[in-house]
Every structure is written in structure tokens, then in C-alpha cells.
Amino acid sequence: MKKCLVWLLAAALLLAGCGKKTASQAESLRQRYREMQAAHMEAEITCHLDTENRTFTVSCDWTPTGAGTTVTGPEDLAGLTASVSGEDLTVSYDGAALSAGSLRDVAPANCLPWLLRAMEEGYLVEAGQETLEGLDCLRLALDTTAPGGKVLCTVWLGGDGAPLYAEFSQDSRVVLTAR
């Protein structure tokens, strides 16, 4: 019985050490995101609605002062552009621009910049190692706040620190995914 207890205590100490390593790795990676001055991202965004899912392919250019997201697919929406500056959203297509007002929630137009903001400023709820599609990943769950309520951003990061997959949840429901 004593040998079993010794092994359990040793395992607990090893696991505690792994948790510290993961937290340190997460903080180091988040610091890299805080220092970033520009980013270009491409992703497949799926919006999970009550009755259906809608998928878009987007390209996003981000700087600390704003971001522009352009829909590249499906073809009938290709070229639609959303510009995000602070809390303001402008949608444009074929030269015409329309102020879409204030962003209150995470949406396909702002989820990639939201992901970067979450990596910089979000409250780290959880950090751990996981496998995603055969790749070892660092998984972070980051709590962010929006005027429309809390958004939990869960992101799986590859060995180079780049996001491989992200989920955005509101009211315990996944509303958007990015891959």
C-alpha cells in the first residue's frame, strides 16, 4: 500500500510540473502575439446557426489599429470586404461601402481579429496539450468580453505557435469555428 501511495504522489508531482510547463509555454506564446505588428491569415469560417451551418473562406490582414477581412468563397459572396477598426465595422463590395455600426458579438467578419485580440488580452481559463488531426497542439481557452456578452475563444496552436483551429462560444454554445 505504501509503494502505491509513493507512486501516486510521484505521478501527482510530475503532472503538476507538466501543468507549470504548459502555463509557461502558453504565456511565452501569448507574449509573441502581444508584440506582433501585422498578420495575414486565411481560414474557413463556419457560422453555426440554429437551423443550419454556413461556411465562408476568408482572407484577413490585421494590424494593431484595425483589420480587413475579404470573403474568397463561396463564389457568390467573393469580394465582400469587412473592415474592423476598434468597435466599428464597415462592409464594402465593388466600391460601395456601408457603415455596419458597432460590433457587439463575434461574427464571421471579425472572428480572426477577435482571435488575435483573445491571444493578447483574453483571460486564460485553461491550457493543455492535445492532439488535433494527428498533430500535437497547445490548446488554450481564453475568456473575452464583448458588449453583447462573454465570448470563450478556444484555440489549438501548432508547434510554431500558429492557430490551427479555433472555436468561439457564447452562452455555452459554439457559434463560430475557424480552420
Label every model-predicted segment.
Residues 1-16:
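Sec-dependent bacterial lipoprotein signal peptides
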Residues 16-65, 76:
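N-terminal leader/targeting segments and the immediate start of mature chains
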Residues 34, 43, 47, 91-147:
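Flexible, processing/modification-adjacent segments and terminal tails
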Residues 38, 79-81, 134:
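A glycine-biased structural micro-motif
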Residues 45-51, 62-66, 73-75, 95, ...:
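Beta-strand elements of well-folded, non-transmembrane domains
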Residues 53-57, 77-80, 148-153, 175:
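Short, surface-exposed coil-to-beta transition loops
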Residues 59-114, 173-174:
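An acidic-aromatic
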Residues 68, 125-179:
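Gly/Pro-enriched, hydrophobic low-complexity segments
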